[in-house]
Amino acid sequence: MPGMRRLLIVLLSVVPLYGASPEIFRVRLDTTKGPIVIEVHREWAPRGADRFHELVTSGYFDDSRFFRVVKGQWAQFGINGDPAVATRWRGRTIPDDPPKQSNVRGTVTFAFAVPNGRTTQVYIALKNLADPQDAQGFVPFGRVVEGMDVADSLNSEYGENAGSGIRAGKQQPLFDGGNAYMDRAYPRLDRILHAKVIP
């Protein structure tokens, strides 16, 4: 038992503890095209809302690229530009939330490859994606309340080529090379300059 207690103390000293996020909060993404404001509803997806709050308040999204933008479909982000940081978070999965909201235009949802596999990648629905996203377990945790025109204007010239979705299995260069790779291979990707919780 003393060994378990020591292990717990060590774990608590190296793993940051984040509590529950506020029930409703707003996040402003200052992007290269202008601001996008997301209103998060914890009731929709508690685990997703808590993780998003944790990522924003830790600075994870700052200087990250919108690496997967398909015009009229989605705008995806959430791979940190520092390969060490991105890799460290890649294995920190959260359990699924039961669906309560539909993937309609403007909703914000975690992407994932397998059940209970959400980590850091998020997409904004640029159109109604309820079919097939709802049936596949993609659970919105928020919605864009300001700046949907900004989301629509994000550079989509690279489409699925700059990493694609998690399930496509083509993201390793983004994790290995970070922003240096993305800026070299896809220099016109739009990015998040800074993300923060706002009143």
Regions found by a protein language model. Give the residues of each.
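Cyclophilin-like peptidyl-prolyl cis-trans isomerases
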Residues: L17-P199
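Sec-dependent N-terminal signal peptides
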Residues: R6-V15
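N-terminal secretory signal peptides that target proteins for export/translocation
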Residues: M1-M4
